[in-house]
From Swiss-Prot:
Protein known as: Heat-inducible transcription repressor HrcA
GO molecular function, one term: DNA binding
InterPro entries for this protein: GAF-like_dom_sf, HrcA, HrcA_C, WH-like_DNA-bd_sf, WH_DNA-bd_sf, WHTH_HrcA_DNA-bd, WHTH_transcript_rep_HrcA_IDD
Statement: the UniProt record of this protein carries the keyword Repressor: yes
Domain of life, per lineage: Bacteria
Gene: hrcA
Gene3D superfamilies recorded: 3.30.450.40, Heat-inducible transcription repressor hrca homolog, domain 3 (3.30.390.60), Winged helix-like DNA-binding domain superfamily/Winged helix DNA-binding domain (1.10.10.10)
The protein's role, per its UniProt record: Negative regulator of class I heat shock genes (grpE-dnaK-dnaJ and groELS operons). Prevents heat-shock induction of these operons.
Pfam families, per database record: HrcA, HrcA_DNA-bdg
Family named by the database record: Belongs to the HrcA family.
Alphabetical UniProt keywords: Repressor, Stress response, Transcription, Transcription regulation
GO biological process: negative regulation of DNA-templated transcription
UniProt keyword annotation of Transcription regulation present: yes
């Protein structure tokens, strides 16, 4: 455990270093720390011995080590902090008209990436927690059709498929009827379970040959089990990490799994400093924050960047963007649920 003065010195070194990326000497600290230069140097030496500070090769100053950044995050960083100076810029960046949910989530991801210079990832509500609230089949021709699904009464998902060769029109009607009777209004988690248990038995009552029918069920509903992921600033990862992080960001489903695992049960926010179980994120910092998607649940807003990032500003931007995004989504869903009259 370090003393209060040593804690203040570490915090100030972190703050100054993240702003200038230059080693910090005792003279710079004296402007804020009410102690002699010798006392400050002695405390800096103790912090270095504890592994919280590192010597710079080209200067007599010190800079935070990865362990020092981690100590700062765990003991001094407020995860709910907001810098009022950033509020106006974020609100201004959100001044655009969105025509669908994906537009807002993608825009929010770009805003966070552009304002930090790092990599931003936004996830929609976890698939397992969404509900199938609408289903229809539209026959496009004699050989193909379109499954139109609605999640949470607002999110459309469409899947085009080739009609099995032995299918007649009445078979498509039966397919739709099974979905409406057994799967509609259920959660995606329930659907995944029923496709392996109930549906194979039900299909036998309606169809003579069941193999291609079960394959059709799997094909149509497989889309529901995938995370909706919006990545921005992927190229930025090359400035603070190696190629493995850049390549990892291409695997959006694995990215989603790793980011969800960074939050413990019941947590609304977390900061990992070189502490991810994912090898591609082991040498970077990951800020993760839940934000409200009204009427549906929680999305996830994440920022991936260097260990020596400006944590206070990054946390502030994540919090502000999460709040502004939730407000925009609230307006969007209220509009969808309201009576809409066409004006001539």
């Amino acid at each position: 455990m370090i003393t209060q003065r040593q804690n203040d010195i570490l915090n100030l070194i972190v703050e100054l270093f993240t702003q200038t990326h230059e080693p910090v000497g005792s003279k710079a600290l004296q402007r804020t720390i009410d102690s002699s230069s010798a006392t400050i140097r002695n405390d800096m030496a103790k912090l270095e011995k504890l592994g919280l500070l590192e010597k710079a090769h080209t200067s007599s100053g010190r800079m935070p080590s990865p362990a020092g950044f981690k100590y700062f995050v765990e003991h001094s960083l407020r995860l709910d902090s907001i810098d009022e100076q950033d509020i106006y810029h974020v609100i201004k960046a959100f001044d655009f008209e969105a025509f669908k949910l994906e537009d807002m989530l993608q825009k929010a991801s770009h805003i966070l990436s552009e304002m930090t210079g790092y990599t931003s990832v936004i996830l929609d509500v976890e698939p397992a927690r969404q509900r199938l609230t609408g289903f229809d089949v539209v026959q496009l021709s004699n050989h193909d059709a379109l499954a139109v699904m609605t999640l949470d009464e607002s999110k459309p998902v469409t899947v085009q498929f080739a009609i099995p060769r032995n299918f007649l029109t009445r078979d498509l009607i039966a397919f739709k009827a099974i979905v409406e009777e057994r799967l509609l209004d259920g959660s995606v988690m329930d659907i995944h379970y029923k496709l392996r248990t109930e549906i194979p038995q039900i299909v036998q009552k309606y169809f003579v040959t069941t193999d291609n029918v079960l394959q059709l069920f799997d094909y149509v509903f497989s889309e529901l089990f995938l995370e909706t992921v919006f990545v921005a600033g992927k190229v930025n990862s090359l400035t603070y990490s190696d190629l493995s992080t850049y390549q990892f960001l291409d695997n959006e489903q694995q990215v989603a799994i790793s980011l969800r695992q960074s939050l413990k049960e019941g947590e609304m926010a977390s900061v990992q400093v070189a502490d991810s179980q994912e090898a591609a994120l082991a040498d970077v910092s990951v800020l993760t924050h839940k934000f409200l998607i009204p009427y549906r649940g929680f999305g996830l807003l994440s920022l991936i960047g260097p260990i020596d990032m400006d944590y206070r500003r990054s946390v502030s931007l994540v919090n502000i963007i999460g709040k502004v995004l939730a407000a925009k989504l609230g307006d969007y869903y209220r509009y969808l649920n309201s009576n809409h009259y066409e004006v001539h």
